[in-house]
Amino acid sequence: MRNNLDVIAAYSIMLGLIILVGFLQSWSMALSILCLCLISAVMTIGANIQWGYAGLINFGIMGYTALGGLAAVLVSTPPVEDAWKAGGLDMLLCAFIIFSMILIIRLVLQKFSKSKNRNYIIAAVIIAGLILLRLISAPAIESIEAINPATTGFLGGMGLPILFSWIVGAFFAGGLAYVIGKIALGLRADYLAIATLLISEIVIAVIKHEDWLSRGVKNVIGLKRPVPYEIDLQGKEWFINLVQKFHQGSLNLISDNLEKQQALKQLVIESSTVFVKLCFAGLFTVVVIVLLIVTQKALYSPWGRMMRAIRDNEEAANAMGKNVVKQHLLIFVLGSAIVGIAGAMMVTYDGLFTPGSYRPMRYTFLIWVMVI
């Protein structure tokens, strides 16, 4: 009971401070802070699932966040037809080659598990694949990046509503977490933390330097919104009437009609910004509430009790027949997928994707401070 009261008091103080910002500065700034808090809360839920449920330390939050942001770009931006004509098919061929290399290596590991030549065969496949990839991708990338580099210079995306990117971002981050988990989850806690941090830096480096995919440090701007634009709201009669009705008292104090119209116009501009951020806050609140309900249900389910048992004593859980490695991998993927959702939410809110802005202090260690 005492803990519940402390939690309620903490959230009440935070909400009070946000309201105070609204009164003393502006409601637009207060709602911006609220939206960023909600996005950070989603990231924290993802990290807390890994640490609180399974005792896994993941310092790669920045990388999963960036993948979520990349998903927003690849889903919402329209395809650049000229870039696809210049080298899109070649890049698809490169993706097919990579997929084929993975299948061949997996087949070699299965068929030549006891052969002394297994490693030589795998090395030959990798070297041959990399040479082939280089020969095909280099001219294709050069051609793609030469297509109107000031505004495009990349393949673009699918042109779908950006809300779909929240799901795609979860799959991107979860897929990377699956690969990392297969390799690194057997490491000791401190080595796992270092490995995940380094892999996240690699992800950021790839996104920053592969212009054909994400425009790199040239950034992607003007992403689609799931809410109305301010300029559109300012021309809507229903919105103008709503603002006029809400501020009727202050407008009635102005006797001059010209001044009243100018005051109303300024109020409409300010209110449009507040309305848009209220819409974003509503969307983000729904996501946070759904995640909190699902995670709480999972925590007190038989599966949640099993995860806590594994966290407290892996040896005992393993002796009771629980697959510790499998459950660790599952929780690692789930937590990372939630962080990927948060990354897509952030790019959706900002309306732009800036790979150069991803820093460990903001997107990893600050989130861990919130978890702790």
Map each language-model feature to its residues.
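Transmembrane alpha-helices and adjacent helix-loop boundaries
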Residues: 1-372
